[in-house]
């Protein structure tokens, strides 16, 4: 996974995602509001779309590169839910503490911290998986998406 991560052109990936949102918004079969959700790198990529006016909600699970994206997203165009693990080797709590006021200043940001959990707590295939934390995060995510996407 790290080999692919290191080879990824973040600028191109973000541009591709923006174009995908534009495409979906123009499709006749897409009804209602669109949201974005991602895990780890996907959580960072989801946040890269935070200024996209075509989206209505975003969710990031332990996005490990959000700090580097802050200067590219002066404001969030829609509410965003951020899930972070309390004992994450890729996103230290010091970084989460730094990010909270910065992200909150750019828009409607909600934070959930899962104390004692490690990166990947939501992935059943990892030894860091926590059913309890995963179920709590899923419930929060579903409530959040229903609140912002369902009319």
Predicted ranges, named:
Residues 1-151:
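N-terminal cap/leader regions of alpha/beta-hydrolase-fold enzymes
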């Amino acid at each position: 996974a790290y080999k692919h991560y290191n080879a990824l052109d973040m600028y191109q990936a973000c541009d591709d995602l923006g174009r995908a949102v534009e495409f979906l918004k123009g499709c006749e079969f897409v009804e209602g509001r669109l949201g974005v959700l991602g895990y780890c790198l996907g959580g960072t990529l989801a946040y890269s779309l935070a200024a996209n006016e075509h989206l209505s909600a975003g969710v990031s699970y332990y996005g490990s590169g959000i700090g580097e994206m802050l200067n590219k997203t002066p404001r969030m165009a829609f509410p965003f839910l951020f899930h972070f693990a309390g004992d994450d080797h890729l996103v230290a709590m010091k970084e989460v503490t730094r990010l909270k006021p910065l992200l909150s200043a750019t828009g409607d940001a909600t934070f959930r911290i899962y104390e004692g959990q490690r990166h990947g707590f939501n992935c059943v295939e990892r030894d860091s998986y926590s059913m309890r934390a995963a179920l709590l995060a899923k419930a929060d995510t579903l409530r959040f998406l229903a609140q912002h996407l369902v009319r």
